[in-house]
Amino acid sequence: MAEHDAPPESGAARSPPAKKRGGDARSPQQDAQPLSSRDRVRERDEDKDRERHRRHGEDRERYRDRESVRERGEGSRDRERHRREHREESRDRERHHREHREGSRDRERHHREHREGSRDRERHHREHREGSRDRERHHRDHREGSRDRERHHRDHRERSERREHRDRSDDRDYRRSCDRDAERRDRDRDGHRRHRSRSPLRSESQSKRMSGFDQRPSEAIPILAPDATPSQLPELPAANPGMFPNMLPNLVNVPALGQPLAMTQQATRHARRVYVGGLPPIANEQTVAVFFNQVMAAIGGNTFALGHAVVNVYINHDKKFAFVEMRSVEEASNAMALDGIMFEGAPVKVRRPTDYNPSQAAALGPSQPNPNLNLAAVGLTPGAGGGLEGPDRIFVGGLPYYFTEAQVRELLETFGPLRGFDIVKDKETGNSKGYAFCLYKDGTVTDIACAALNGIQLGDRTLTVRRANQGAEPRPEQENILLQAQQEAQMKRLVYEVGRTLTTKVVCLTQVVSADDLRDDEEYNDILEDMTLEGHKYVPHSTIAESFIIRPHAKFAIRPKLTEDTNLFHLDLTNHMFSSLPFCHVHVCSY
């Protein structure tokens, strides 16, 4: 095979056939003659040379073919290698682009997390500002209540002074009248005795009698019974001409009761007002007044057949609440049954105002709604509202904003089961406003709970626990246990403080790693370090007391320096750190 692959020798390839020698030239006559053995040998040699020359030509042709095939094969391999290198370069470029895109996504995720952190900080600041506004509103309400009480006391003093002044004036008028009657009788006796004509003084006396100033009416004025209705008013005598000019022109036969009526309205104002909360932004004084007038008429809550139940409406548009002043105490009590009624597509709360005094209101009229009200006419269920009304309703202020409803309930139910509970939340954000209202099933524990919980320090805030109706007085059966309540208050505070020091709360993260990943100590330390560094991105390092992993349960725990920060840690880690891990679970536990 090697012989065929090797190129033929150039000398053998190019050697022409051997020429016949001159002596060997033969004539045609000689050719016709039989060849000799030498000639035959020579011809055979020539044939062999020609055959060898032909084979060499074929070998050269095959060699050229193989060379061309080999060159074509090497070119194909070069092209294949070139294509393979091109594909590898393309893959390298694609991998570079993919890494660049991943880096861009990481940067975008970092920016997004930074923006979310900024929004969280802004939300925290906003909640702090809202809490400040709530505290300011509470102080303002307290100041308004103080001003109302001061105004009430001032009105009471003024009424007392006017009453005393009127009594003194009546005494002076009575003494003057007696003196004038005695003087007139003396003058009459002197005139009859001296037989003199009427003097100017007597004429002056007679003119006084003509004015009717010092004379009793010819008919006694009937006294109105306390329980008389307007339809039972007795017929009064016609007024003398010239008396009380320009006063009550359309009510000739009605006595002047303006000042006592105003005094009565002022005294009953606290019992005739109702608080309406949760108003929609489009509400105004007119729409609220028209709505309550129509609803009161629909349920049969009006005490008078004519006129409207609403006298005045005051709206605080910023806080979305209003004070609605009713015409009578009974109508205000009937309006309490409208708690939860739909107004402009939103349910509203109907409550007593903070200056409502149940003990004083009990003497002015009914304090509960009429049981015969037709609440079904306005889509309400009898007995559904007013679950937190009554003299034993408790106001709980100063709650930390991160306290959940369950935590507040747990704190309050240490004194007994609750009949009603309502934690006030912001309608837009749903976050707690830091105060709540509750009502115990057993009213005898109301003052005990107030005395025990008031003044307790929760985090950076101090609880304010008192009766919601500041004017409400303890029930008679509660007066004997007030001393016991004060003694138990100190014990409650002590138990609560001890419980806080013995309980250690941590934020626990589960389903982050498996138990097999923690078998190796070196891997355990690496995972703990990574988790701790990741946690410090969202939780301030200065507020962390300890971080550890519980083996073999594969639970990563962070213990804050302050127990009150546990809920903040829980919220931050839930919203940020493991949002990309759908199976991770973050919760608060004790150890």
From Swiss-Prot:
Location of the region described as Disordered in the Swiss-Prot/TrEMBL record: 1-215
Tree of life domain: Eukaryota
Gene Ontology CC annotations of this record: commitment complex; nuclear speck; U2-type prespliceosome; U2AF complex
Pfam families linked: RRM_1 (PF00076)
SMART domains membership: RRM
SUPFAM superfamilies found in the cross-reference section: RNA-binding domain, RBD
NCBIfam families linked to this entry: U2AF_lg (TIGR01642)
Protein name per Swiss-Prot or TrEMBL: Splicing factor U2af large subunit A
Organism field: Triticum aestivum (Wheat)
Gene, per the UniProt record: U2AF65A
